[in-house]
Amino acid sequence: MSLLTEVETPTRNGWECKCSDSSDPLVIAASIIGILHLILWILDRLFFKFIYRRLKYGLKRGPSTEGVPESMREEYRQEQQNAVDVDDGHFVNIELE
């Protein structure tokens, strides 16, 4: 029997020894952190455009609108929306002919 064959075929007891200690608090904590990391990564990839727009524009508070006429408020809202819409410039659109 070659050394390679012995390495490739671990005994059943060997696997049981490695897996039987899964009640260790460190293993449980690492598993929970790994699962949470995976979930957050998936959500980030699905909603990254929305999330980063909100962080860039949505959390900024504008000037107070107290005492400002409604027409000026609407104009300000429109300017803010246009600023958000223009931010799509770093995405590449490829059109095939």
UniProtKB/Swiss-Prot annotation:
Q: Which Gene3D superfamilies match?
A: 6.10.250.1640
Residues that span the membrane, as ranges = 23-43
Q: What does the entry give for GO biological process?
A: protein complex oligomerization; symbiont genome entry into host cell via pore formation in plasma membrane; symbiont-mediated suppression of host autophagy
This entry's Gene Ontology molecular function terms read: monoatomic ion channel activity; proton transmembrane transporter activity
What controls its activity?
Answer: The M2 protein from most influenza A strains is inhibited by amantadine and rimantadine, resulting in viral uncoating incapacity. Emergence of amantadine-resistant variants is usually rapid.
Q: Where is the signal peptide?
A: none
Outline the segment boundaries, as ranges, of region: Disordered: 61-80
Q: Mind naming one GO cellular-component term on file for this protein? A: virion membrane
Virion surface side: which ranges?
A: 1-22
The UniProt entry, under InterPro entries, shows: Flu_M2
Q: What does this protein do?
A: Forms a proton-selective ion channel that is necessary for the efficient release of the viral genome during virus entry. After attaching to the cell surface, the virion enters the cell by endocytosis. Acidification of the endosome triggers M2 ion channel activity.
Give the record's subunit note.
Homotetramer; composed of two disulfide-linked dimers held together by non-covalent interactions. May interact with matrix protein 1.
Notes on the domains: Cytoplasmic tail plays an important role in virion assembly and morphogenesis.
Please identify the protein, giving its name as recorded: Matrix protein 2
- Source organism per entry reads Influenza A virus (strain A/Equine/Alaska/1/1991 H3N8)
The encoding gene is M
